């Protein structure tokens, strides 16, 4: 239902946020920015 949809949206947002944080961290570490 609506709650499941909201849960999925939140999970996807958290995933993409986590991915971008990881990407910026690894780029800083390897100095490829």
Swiss-Prot record:
Cellular component annotations (GO), alphabetically ordered: extracellular region
The protein's name: Brevinin-2JD
Location (main, coarse): secreted
Transmembrane segments: none
GO biological process: defense response to fungus; defense response to Gram-negative bacterium; defense response to Gram-positive bacterium; hemolysis in another organism
InterPro entries on file: Antimicrobial_frog_2 (IPR012521)
Annotated organism of origin: Odorrana jingdongensis (Jingdong frog)
Keywords for the protein's UniProt record, in alphabetical order: Amphibian defense peptide, Antibiotic, Antimicrobial, Cytolysis, Disulfide bond, Fungicide, Hemolysis, Secreted
A Pfam family matched in the record: Antimicrobial_2
Presence of the UniProt keyword Secreted in the record: yes
Lineage, uppermost ranks: Eukaryota, Metazoa, Chordata, Craniata, Vertebrata
Disulfide bonds: 27-33
Keyword Repeat: no
Subcellular localization: Secreted
Tissue-wise expression: Expressed by the skin glands.
Family statement drawn from the similarity comment of this UniProt entry: Belongs to the frog skin active peptide (FSAP) family. Brevinin subfamily.
Cited function: Has antibacterial activity against E.coli ATCC 25992 (MIC=38 uM), E.coli CIB 84492 (MIC=38 uM), S.aureus ATCC 25923 (MIC=19 uM) and S.aureus CIB 85462 (MIC=19 uM). Has antifungal activity against C.albicans (MIC=19 uM). Has weak hemolytic activity against rabbit erythrocytes.
């Amino acid at each position: 239902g609506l709650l499941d949809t909201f849960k999925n949206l939140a999970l996807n947002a958290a995933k993409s946020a986590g991915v971008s944080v990881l990407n910026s961290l690894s780029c800083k570490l390897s100095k490829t920015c």
